[in-house]
Curated annotation (Swiss-Prot):
GO terms for cellular component: cytoplasm. The keyword Cytoplasm applies. InterPro entries: UreE (IPR012406), UreE_C_dom (IPR007864), UreE_N (IPR004029), UreE_N_sf (IPR036118). This is Urease accessory protein UreE. Coiled coil: none annotated. SMART domains: UreE_N. Keywords: Chaperone, Cytoplasm, Nickel, Nickel insertion. Belongs to the UreE family. GO terms for biological process: protein folding; protein-containing complex assembly; urea metabolic process. It comes from Enterobacter sp. (strain 638).
Length: 152
């Protein structure tokens, strides 16, 4: 089995690829199947969030694997009004929903309850199978390092 131990920070010739959903791309240890059918193990530093296009390598550098973000069931909100989009971000963030934020568009794992909530704000919510690349704060190891205590 191939053991992938590091993420590379510059381009290298790719020897294979692996398509992974976000639930695996946030793990530092996992057994995965490369797109060519070979098995590989992730043995990466903790707190690393893999993105589509990232390159992983074995210790000896003989294998360079490109990460592909798998299409997932997502809800998609498209809106030209920055105020409405900000309201949607606020309410989803208040519920600690992992969220992908792009100009005029939001994506989150499909959830009909959240879809209905956003429709109450007159937002258009659709369902799609697309790569999901949420903001890193929802997944990195320091995501919840802030204090919830308040002093007055």
């Amino acid at each position: 089995m191939i053991t992938l131990t590091q993420r590379l920070d510059h381009a290298h010739p790719v020897t294979a690829s692996v398509t992974l959903p976000i639930d695996i791309r946030v793990k530092s240890r996992a057994k995965v199947e490369l797109n060519d059918g070979r098995e590989a193990g992730l043995m990466l530093p903790r707190g690393l969030l893999l993105r589509g296009g990232d390159l992983l390598s074995t210790d000896d550098g003989n294998e360079i694997i490109e990460v592909i973000a798998a299409p997932e069931s997502v809800s998609v909100v498209r809106c030209a009004d920055p105020y409405l989009l900000a309201r949607a971000c606020y309410h989803l963030g208040n519920r600690h929903v992992p969220l992908q934020i792009m100009p005029g568009e939001l994506r989150y794992h499909h959830d009909h309850v959240l879809d209905d909530m956003l429709r109450q704000f007159d937002l258009d919510v659709t369902f799609a199978h697309l790569p999901f690349e949420p903001e890193a704060g929802a997944y990195t190891s320091d995501a919840h390092s802030h204090s919830h205590a308040h002093s007055h």
